[in-house]
């Protein structure tokens, strides 16, 4: 079942924001990730692919508690993109949230005001500030990690009014496939908000807990956990990684290369954990 069109709206209406959560074994942070993102969204899809920890019960409970949420259990991650592909061409922003991405809700609400005011009407994609977390205080009042910039920003907020379609082979939502842009838009139409304001003043900022355990069933080094694109994306890259492992050659840790750039810093996280779930 795909997300349908919005009801008929008048010219004074604002864009819809559709949250797109796709997770697998993320029961440590997923509730906080969803609750922080939900006030920003008009509608939020909670999608699970094969979780064996407590993720599914958490998402089902949130789908009942949050009026804008609905739960989907997927047989393959590609279904997450199929659910939203029909939104192309509509006045909709698609906001992808992973189970290890905790946003500043107050900042998101300020960003929503800017979107409603039309500031980003000619923008295809918005990139925000990120702290790639290597340590989180026990009281969750502070965290240490590496900031974007200089790290790569991994936030995913797309203006579907800029495209006619997003089809082709998309292994998961908002990844891969073939994007067909409307006249006047290109893939380069991006706003790098992480370059426009420091972390403390950013309206679009995220704690990315990629170096922390994200599942109660997780063991070993969280930094080596494969993401969906590694499992289902470029087949040649998967073959090369497997071959290197078989012959005992090292495999590049992409998380370190993307998310451990620059100095390690410590920041306050009170804005991200202002209330208990």
Question: What is each model feature region?
Answer:
Residues 1-35:
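N-proximal low-complexity "stem/linker" segments adjacent to membrane-targeting elements
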Residues 2, 82-84, 92, 105-277:
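Catalytic-site signature of metal-activated, phosphate-bearing donor transferases
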Residues 24-25, 52, 74-78, 101, ...:
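Catalytic phosphate/metal-binding cores of nucleic-acid and nucleotide-processing enzymes, i.e., regions
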Residues 33, 75-90:
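Glycine-rich, basic loop-to-helix element that forms the pyrophosphate-binding segment
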Residues 42-50, 72:
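Short beta-strand/loop segment that forms part of the nucleotide-sugar
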Residues 48-59, 76:
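A conserved acidic beta->alpha catalytic loop
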Residues 60-81:
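Conserved donor nucleotide-binding strand/loop of the catalytic core
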Residues 91-102:
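Short beta-strand-to-loop acidic/aromatic patch adjacent to the donor-nucleotide binding site
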């Amino acid at each position: 079942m795909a997300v349908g069109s919005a009801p008929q709206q008048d010219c004074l209406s604002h864009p819809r924001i559709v949250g797109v959560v796709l997770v697998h074994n993320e029961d440590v942070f997923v509730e906080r990730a969803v609750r922080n993102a939900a006030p920003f969204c008009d509608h939020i899809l909670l999608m699970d692919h094969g979780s064996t920890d407590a993720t599914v019960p958490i998402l089902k409970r949130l789908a009942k508690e949050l009026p804008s949420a609905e739960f989907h259990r997927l047989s393959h991650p590609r279904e997450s993109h199929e659910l939203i592909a029909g939104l192309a061409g509509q006045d909709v922003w698609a906001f992808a949230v992973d189970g290890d991405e905790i946003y500043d809700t107050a900042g998101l609400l300020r960003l929503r005001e800017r979107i409603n005011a039309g500031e980003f009407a000619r923008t295809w994609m918005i990139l925000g500030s990120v702290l790639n977390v290597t340590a989180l205080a026990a009281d969750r009042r502070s965290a240490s990690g590496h900031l974007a910039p200089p790290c790569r920003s991994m936030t995913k907020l797309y203006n579907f009014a800029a495209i006619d379609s997003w089809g082709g082979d998309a292994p998961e939502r908002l990844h891969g496939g073939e994007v067909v842009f409307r006249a006047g838009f290109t893939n380069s139409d991006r706003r790098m908000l992480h370059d426009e304001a420091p972390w403390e003043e950013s309206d679009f900022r995220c704690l990315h807990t990629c170096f922390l355990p994200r599942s109660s069933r997780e063991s070993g080094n969280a930094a080596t956990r494969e993401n969906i694109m590694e499992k289902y994306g470029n087949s040649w890259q998967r073959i090369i990684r497997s071959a290197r492992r078989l012959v005992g050659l090292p495999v590049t840790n992409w998380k370190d290369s993307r998310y451990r750039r620059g100095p390690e810093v410590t920041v306050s996280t009170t804005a991200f954990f202002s209330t208990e779930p």
